[in-house]
């Protein structure tokens, strides 16, 4: 496992929850970090928790584009966030791995109404994962998370139900072994 002092926690980093994590909010989750600094802490979005609601369930104006929503995290679950790979949504925060977080919501609405938006280039989240200053570093020191570089393919092209295992397998070595860790080791 990488030394927590050597880990880059910058935007675009993925956090893969350790197999033994039992917190139901983060168990077998993959979090994309969007913002991290020593003064304010860390902001991220859980990538692999699809909700049983769609965008049209929370925003009436999306009748032609109604993708599933994802739980971005347990903090402020009433807030809407989005990741995309589109160049026609200005104002977002560019993330490594060819992704953008946020941007001009009016442009998003126009794309959705015009039928130009698709789940393979625009994904919506309710809430976010947040850590106070130093909190995430402490959790990394406890080996609760495995950091990895992010890429748009993990957000838009990989089945969310398989994402946790897929990233660990791709990391290879000891991480690939963790991908096969049973959901409940007591049942093994």
Curated annotation (Swiss-Prot):
Entry similarity comment:
Belongs to the UPF0301 (AlgH) family.
- One family name in Pfam for this protein: DUF179
Q: Protein name, please?
A: UPF0301 protein SRU_0495
Q: Which GO terms describe its cellular component?
A: cytosol
Disulfide bond entries: none
What SUPFAM superfamilies does its record include?
Answer: VC0467-like
Q: Which Gene3D superfamilies match?
A: VC0467-like
């Amino acid at each position: 496992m990488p030394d927590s002092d050597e880990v880059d926690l910058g935007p675009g980093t993925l956090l893969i929850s350790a197999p033994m994590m039992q917190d139901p909010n983060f168990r077998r989750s993959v979090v994309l970090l969007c913002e991290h600094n020593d003064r304010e802490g860390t902001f991220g979005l859980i990538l692999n928790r699809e909700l049983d609601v769609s965008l049209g369930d929370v925003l009436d104006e999306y009748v032609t584009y109604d993708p599933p929503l994802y739980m971005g995290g347990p903090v402020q679950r009433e807030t809407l966030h989005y990741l995309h790979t589109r160049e026609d949504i200005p104002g977002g925060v560019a993330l490594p791995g060819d992704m953008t977080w946020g941007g001009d919501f009016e442009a998003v609405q126009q794309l959705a109404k015009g039928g130009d938006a698709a789940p393979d280039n625009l994904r919506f989240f309710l809430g976010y994962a947040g850590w106070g200053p130093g909190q995430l570093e402490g959790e990394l020191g406890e080996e609760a998370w495995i950091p990895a570089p992010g890429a748009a393919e993990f957000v838009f092209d990989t089945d969310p139900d398989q994402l946790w295992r897929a990233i660990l397998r791709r990391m290879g070595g000891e991480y690939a072994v963790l991908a096969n860790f049973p959901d409940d080791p007591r049942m093994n």
